[in-house]
Amino acid sequence: MKHFIAAAVAALSLNLAFAVELEGAKFDDTAKVGGADLVVNGLGVRSKFGKRYVAALYLPTKSSDAESIVASKGPKRVALHLLKDGDGKTFSKAFVGGIEENSSEAELAGIKDRVAVFFSMMQSMGDVKAGSVVVIDWVPEKGTYVSVNNKALGKEIAGEDFFKALLKVWLGKDPVQGDLKTGLLGKS
């Protein structure tokens, strides 16, 4: 009987170790990006006009320092689990606005063409239902990849400078939402 109970506890522990959840949105606690293993750094809820999405930040190693995360080399992932229906037009405007708020004029000048490509890419996703998952991966030496429900949106967008500008939407000095940033940093 002791062995059965120990096995049951171990099995339950394994199930808990393979997923993290917030607001009913479940994420794997690890991800593979560009051949590298990443771990969930933190989760947060975007709640402008109601709860819109849960975001998960994946990194090679956990960190609670936003500036060092943005500056760090290596693959990264931001996954957004939608809690409400959304559309590409709204997403694209919000992302571009966040990039503009957190980038200098010189940074924006260097990435403006890629921001335009990203804007078009996000608009092309059209309407998305609650429960959909938008994944944004940074793969070093390759680029930024975006997918919705495991379907790629366009081709990769080159340049680490672009991904860093995008990451600052959530982790910059003027993030889209302060408590969302806190959650992604694993501080909530």
Locations of regions flagged by a protein language model:
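Sec-dependent N-terminal signal peptides
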Residues: 4-13
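Flexible glycine-rich active-site/ligand-binding loops centered on an Asp-His dyad
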Residues: 155-180
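Cysteine/selenocysteine-centered motifs that mediate thiol-based redox chemistry or coordinate metal-sulfur cofactors
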Residues: 178-188
